[in-house]
């Protein structure tokens, strides 16, 4: 139980018959998601057919829009040895980051055999892709992939449909009762756990057989669930960027080398932090435009 256990006792169709309905509607409003409709409706039907048999069925439907996760500040891991990482604003010109609600920027050069950008440059020079004379001019910066915003990996639409059917039988028309109960649920939402999960086409069913009277009860349950098309959004972003990481880092370093040549040709200083920051920005832009899979495209 993630948030505790809730005990519920439903109405018995022998005692509570008829039809009841409910409906709720409203609007959820937020800066990022705007105004969105919310609907929650349901119906319950129950009937006592005889002193021995009664049945009930209920159906409910909910539809709304999840809150958007748009805090893109950066994790600061400097204090990890003392405890949890803190959250800071990303710095201008930063080349390696791990931002909140952006997935895939965990893929970094520091986790590859190259180690840093100069390591990639050395490899490209060894296979004749860039001039060897440029390698010492590459900074030893760690570079991370450009991640995907959470809103690019999910649609934030939430809905659920639930069905509950119960058959009640009293063989001796006394307090001994045999109950068969079936529950079915399907839905889409976002689940927050260790990571953020996009729950898509989730389906769950539970079946119960119960024998009871005023002095005892015996229950047997069967529960089955299918995650459908659900996925961990953090690892979805990571795996998308891992799939073509070598190509992206190579393209990045190649674009940086092109920029270095232009700076040297114009008499500039390639070790100037402002120049390096611009070279990094141009290299990232080119690598993203050339290699990174774009949300909304067929390849993505």
List where the protein language model places each region.
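Outer-envelope beta-barrel architecture signal
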Residues: 15-19, 51-55, 174-178, 205-207, ...
């Amino acid at each position: 139980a993630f948030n505790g256990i809730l005990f519920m006792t439903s109405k018995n169709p022998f005692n509570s018959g008829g039809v009841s309905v409910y409906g709720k509607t409203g609007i959820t409003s937020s800066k990022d998601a705007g105004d969105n409709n919310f609907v929650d409706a349901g119906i319950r039907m129950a009937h006592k057919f005889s002193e021995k048999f009664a049945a009930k069925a209920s159906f409910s439907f909910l539809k709304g829009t999840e809150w958007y996760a748009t805090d893109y500040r950066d994790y600061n891991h400097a204090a990890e040895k003392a405890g949890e990482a803190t959250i800071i604003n990303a710095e201008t010109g930063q080349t390696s980051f791990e931002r909140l609600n952006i997935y895939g920027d965990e893929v970094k050069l520091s986790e590859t055999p190259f180690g840093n950008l100069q390591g990639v440059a050395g490899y490209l020079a060894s296979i004749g892709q860039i001039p060897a004379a440029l390698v010492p001019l590459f900074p030893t910066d760690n570079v991370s992939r450009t991640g995907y915003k959470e809103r690019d990996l999910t649609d934030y639409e939430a809905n659920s449909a639930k069905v509950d059917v119960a058959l009640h039988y009293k063989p001796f028309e006394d307090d001994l009762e045999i109950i068969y109960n079936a529950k079915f649920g399907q839905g889409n939402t976002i689940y927050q756990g260790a990571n953020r999960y996009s729950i898509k086409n989730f389906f769950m069913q539970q079946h119960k057989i119960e024998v009871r009277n005023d002095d005892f009860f015996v229950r047997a349950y069967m529960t089955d669930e299918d995650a459908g098309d659900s996925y961990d959004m953090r690892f979805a972003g990571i795996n998308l960027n891992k799939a073509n990481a070598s190509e992206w880092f190579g393209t990045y370093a190649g674009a940086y080398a092109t920029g270095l040549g232009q700076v040297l040709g114009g008499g500039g200083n390639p070790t100037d932090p402002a120049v390096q920051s611009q070279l990094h920005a141009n290299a990232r832009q080119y690598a993203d435009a050339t290699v990174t899979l774009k949300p909304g495209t067929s390849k993505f």
